[in-house]
Amino acid sequence: MTDLDFIDVADLRREYMKGGLRRHELTEQPLVLFEKWLKQACEARLSDPTAMCVATVDENGQPYQRIVLLKHFDEKGLVFYTNLGSRKASHLEHNQRVSLLFPWYPLERQVCFLGKAEKLSAFEVVKYFHSRPKDSQIAAWASKQSSRISARGVLESKFLELKQKFQHGEVPLPSFWGGYRVTFDSVEFWQGRENRLHDRFIYQKSPEGWSIERLAP
């Protein structure tokens, strides 16, 4: 196999047979249905059911995506944490609009939220930071996220240095570490169906509440 002998992906296909999504199964509030689907993803023992693809856009209009873990959700929004010097945080300084996608492939489902990311309060950040395993807290100090490094050894050496420094007592919260709450105004639920006639429903928020429409696949 040469470097140019790529896999022929055109014929990699299958039917989606896990079920459907009918209007009578929808809930008035999108977060209620999301919680139901998330519970089912957990019960199905999916790997990282809270993993979501977070899409942001830089000042030139170039979109970027990365996988981040959902850490909390309620009627106020969906919460994730990150290094405030990261690429995503830099983008959010210029444009707060984001897209969050939960791809639950084994269940042939996905949920996409559109909304605006706002920084969490210092109280929320401190509370969550100190709930993390100590090594994870130290790792937050060790990594200057999205910066270029010469080798992995540099990162590992820094981690070991900080582990020695913080071996006794509490790890302080880095000033460059925080979180965001995404307040959403659009949520789409997608369920794979046979013959590519997938079920899609979109919730959109207005002053009157949530409207629900079926979309063509």
From Swiss-Prot:
Q: Which residues bind FMN?
A: 66-71, 81-82, 87-88, 110, 145-146, 190, 200
Reactions catalysed according to its record: pyridoxamine 5'-phosphate + O2 + H2O = pyridoxal 5'-phosphate + H2O2 + NH4(+); pyridoxine 5'-phosphate + O2 = pyridoxal 5'-phosphate + H2O2
Give the UniProt record's GO annotations in the biological process aspect.
pyridoxine biosynthetic process
| Pathway(s) served | Cofactor metabolism; pyridoxal 5'-phosphate salvage; pyridoxal 5'-phosphate from pyridoxamine 5'-phosphate: step 1/1; Cofactor metabolism; pyridoxal 5'-phosphate salvage; pyridoxal 5'-phosphate from pyridoxine 5'-phosphate: step 1/1
Its subunit composition reads: Homodimer.
Stated family:
Belongs to the pyridoxamine 5'-phosphate oxidase family.
Q: What is this protein called?
A: Pyridoxine/pyridoxamine 5'-phosphate oxidase
Q: Which gene encodes it?
A: pdxH
